[in-house]
Amino acid sequence: MKQITFAPRNHLLTNTNTWTPDSQWLVFDVRPSGASFTGETIERVNIHTGEVEVIYRASQGAHVGVVTVHPKSDKYVFIHGPENPDETWHYDFHHRRGVIAKGGKVSNLDAMDITAPYTPGALRGGSHVHVFSPDGERVSFTYNDHVMHQLDSALDLRNVGVAAPFGPVNVQKQHPREYSGSHWCVLVSKTTPTPQPGSDEINRAYEEGWVGNHALAFIGDTLSPKGEKVPELFIVELPQDEAGWKAAGDAPLSGTETTLPAPPRGVGQRRLTFTHHR
């Protein structure tokens, strides 16, 4: 074991996918305090020489962090907070986006449209902890929704989503904080504010992980028959082609003014564990 960074600041590794494909570099973000999201750079360090490179530097008062690496190429994805934050719009669970950096160029991963009627393929809030699939084609993330947060913060439930390579998604901006993105984004989990005790319903989906290239496992918070929170493991199988990603089910992919975005047709989570019986 050896120390490879020495600067008097916090160097934070994401909990997955921090090695470059050649196994020579580790990527990290830098924060004055480990508990705050106030870093301005995404960096990497060579594990042999200790050389540090800045991959991206934020501007206009924005902050960045939680970086992961593409499995096959020199490409990085990370959280980007809002530029020019103010009292009405600053970094929060529902005010952040994914950004991809490659070859010195950056682009928004997810689009955001918070003005009805909402744009299919765009999100309406903030994405978080972006992770490439093993083949590098898709990106998973967790999500919180601005529209539902404005309606009632209790309805802004954490969910799991996927960015698929079927963009770009161009938003006709009607709000200064809206933006377009490179990928088609949808939610793949389904939550409810009031799960039925003892059922498979959940009010929170999080900590997802890839199972091959076409499925995600995640933790969902259920209620036991006694009404106690019990985190359980779920799995969801994903569409195989562009048509599948863009096909709406019983509810709109982009959501409504009173409902969250819905998964594509045929995409449904399945419960794997039943630990509340213990």
Residue map of PLM features:
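Sequence signature of WD/YWTD-type beta-propeller architectures
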Residues: 1-278
